[in-house]
Amino acid sequence: RSALKPEPHPHLTIREIKNTNDLLLEMKERVQDYQVLIHSMAVSDYTPVYMTGLDAVEASSNLEEFLSKQNHQAKISSTDEVQVLFLKKTPKIISLVKEWNPAIHLIGFKLLVDVTEDHLIEVARQSLVKNQADLIIANDLTQISAHQHLAIFVEKDRLQTVQTKEEIANLLLEKIHAYDS
């Protein structure tokens, strides 16, 4: 709702996603129709299940009972001093893409914060293998500013470093064109 949206274009369709499950359903339905997927959405690792007061949790003999409950009120009660939030793991959607379309060229992103370049590359390589991606664009948040955006393009046998958003866009376009040839 509050995200910056691109200008309308005849070759652009915008689908609004409210949660991880919406994304899963949209991707599963649509990914089969494409040759290249740029998976740039930062999908939350966890989603809220239920929130309750600490007293209710302490009184419970089985914490799993809270996993099947739902909060129905829109506002959180302010009567409890301490609230406990139960979360559940969401599916890793990028890891499902190749199941849905084994031939698709998959491009993903990895954003870490204040890590060494070697660690950033290592984590990006792990993502490349785990998700069967063709390319992972790795970023460190501390290396991103209004005038600079250091990014490392990590492929199976190649690393390329760029310094700006424009260089990222140009190299990404070059990679996509290469998939087509």
Feature annotation, model-predicted:
Residues 1-111, 115-181:
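A cross-family phosphate/adenosyl-ligand binding-site feature
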